């Protein structure tokens, strides 16, 4: 007995008959051949068996032979949607079980740092142009967005209908931004641009106020980092002119300019007096910026390096969040880190152990002749195109790529534990996640499609 009601069963039979009729040749202009007579006989027999009037199929709607394939395609789409919903239900079930076992998430129980984003976005924001860099406010529920049109915007994640602040920061595209909150609770936002300039803005009273323009690079400024060094707030920048420069925001002076690579310096990260850089020459390098001296370097990438990040050492009391790349090591305390992670256009992420330089009392660090090279300890493969950005949080690394996916890697096993697809319709240029300060369960990504996508619990 059929599970379909009579009307749906009749419609299905008509669709079947129409589909078969659309696949056989039509009637001849003059008479019928033997083959056509046999086909007509088969069609009449099938119509009789299905209890469909073959003469009632001549209407425009009835004669549509594509109706059955369309219905089949809709079933496939429904099945795909069912699979997505089942996956979402499983994620919610896992979260519920975790709450039952461990209680609410808090910094004390470490649940926040082990958070993995869901595969469905919470919401998205249209930036109006390709998003080139994003940065979460270190303390407030705000996100700073930079676009290839040179605009810098700030959105409140609790009310994202309109930007809190927006300014045309540069005449050409912004390549990178960074944010820092000092002891006086002032938020400073640094930008780098294709117009050869770096700028520093103060975010206060829902305004982005320009306080400093840093000029000196002779080509595109690729990346920027802002941090506090002792009592001064400094900015480090790198450029296609092959140089890295360190600036004092208080007066706008360039404190140091040095050339760590032989080709375009694409990216950098800073900790204290040490800077790590990645370049079009496919190498990564450790330098002591106050002297400009190169201390060691690593080779292994096959194409230009897109991003490099320092993996800071964990304090002894945070052993629960430790893995082999950030375990507390007394020998590395003067450096502040033992490993870095880099991404490349070769589709891989690579984790490097940085060799310790020679530390001599009352002298600048010296290269160690016995260990001049980085030690490649892990290669993470999973992306199928350029890997644009990476962030490290707890025991996980988060990467985004031109293959339109965000992947979450377990640093204990170097395996993908979650792959998030279909967030953007174009390349994913940048991501950010809380790596320190407030442990919010929040990830943002920016794409070439002009969208900022937010994933939160």
Curated annotation (Swiss-Prot):
GO CC, any one term: microtubule associated complex
The superkingdom of the source organism is: Eukaryota
Q: Does Coiled coil show up as a keyword for this record?
A: yes
- GO molecular function: any one? dynein complex binding
- Biological processes per GO annotation: cell division; establishment of mitotic spindle orientation; microtubule sliding
CDD domains noted in UniProt: WD40
Q: Which InterPro entries does its entry note?
A: Dynein_regulator_LIS1, G-protein_beta_WD-40_rep, LIS1_N, WD40/YVTN_repeat-like_dom_sf, WD40_repeat_CS, WD40_repeat_dom_sf, WD40_rpt
Family of this protein: Belongs to the WD repeat LIS1/nudF family.
Put simply, this protein is called: Nuclear distribution protein PAC1
Q: Where does this protein come from, organism-wise?
A: Lachancea thermotolerans (strain ATCC 56472 / CBS 6340 / NRRL Y-8284) (Yeast)
């Amino acid at each position: 007995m059929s599970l379909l009601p009579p009307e749906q069963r009749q419609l299905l039979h008509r669709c079947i008959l129409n589909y078969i009729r659309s696949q056989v040749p039509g009637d001849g202009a003059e008479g019928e051949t033997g083959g056509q007579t046999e086909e007509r006989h088969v069609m009449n027999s099938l119509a009789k068996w299905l209890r469909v009037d073959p003469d009632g199929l001549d209407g425009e709607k009835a004669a549509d032979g594509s109706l059955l394939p369309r219905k089949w395609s809709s079933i496939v789409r429904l099945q795909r949607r069912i699979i997505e919903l089942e996956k979402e239900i499983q994620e919610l079930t896992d979260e519920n079980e975790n709450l039952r076992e461990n209680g609410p998430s808090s910094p004390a129980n470490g649940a926040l740092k082990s958070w993995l984003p869901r595969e469905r976005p919470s919401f998205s924001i249209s930036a109006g142009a390709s998003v080139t860099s994003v940065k979460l406010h270190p303390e407030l529920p705000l996100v700073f967005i930079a676009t290839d049109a040179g605009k810098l915007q700030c959105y409140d994640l609790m009310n994202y209908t309109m930007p809190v602040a927006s300014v045309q920061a540069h005449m050409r595209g912004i390549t990178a931004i960074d944010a820092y909150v000092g002891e006086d609770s002032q938020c400073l936002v640094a930008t780098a641009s294709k117009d050869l300039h770096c700028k520093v803005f103060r975010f206060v009273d829902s305004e982005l106020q320009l306080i400093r323009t840093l000029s000196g690079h002779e080509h595109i400024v690729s990346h920027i980092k802002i941090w506090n060094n002792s009592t001064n707030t400094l900015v480090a920048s790198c450029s296609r002119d092959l140089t890295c420069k360190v600036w004092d925001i208080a007066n706008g002076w360039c404190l140091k300019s040095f050339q760590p690579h032989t080709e375009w310096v694409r990216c950098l990260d800073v900790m204290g007096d040490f800077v790590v850089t990645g370049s079009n020459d496919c190498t990564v390098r450790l330098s002591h910026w106050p002297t400009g001296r190169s201390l060691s370097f690593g080779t292994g990438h096959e194409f230009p390096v897109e991003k490099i990040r320092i993996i800071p050492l964990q304090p002894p009391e945070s052993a629960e969040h430790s893995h082999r790349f950030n375990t507390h090591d007394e020998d590395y305390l003067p450096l502040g880190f033992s490993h870095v992670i880099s991404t490349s256009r070769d589709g891989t992420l690579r984790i490097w152990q940085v060799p310790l330089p020679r530390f001599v009392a009352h002298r600048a660090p010296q290269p160690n002749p016995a260990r001049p090279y980085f030690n490649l300890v892990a290669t993470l493969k999973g992306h199928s195109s350029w890997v644009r950005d990476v962030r490290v949080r707890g025991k996980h690394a988060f990467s985004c790529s031109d293959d339109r996916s965000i992947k979450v890697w377990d640093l204990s096993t170097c395996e993908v534990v979650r792959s998030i697809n279909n967030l953007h319709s174009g390349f994913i240029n940048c991501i950010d996640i809380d790596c320190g300060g407030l442990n919010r369960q929040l990830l943002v990504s920016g794409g070439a499609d002009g969208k900022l996508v937010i994933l939160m619990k």
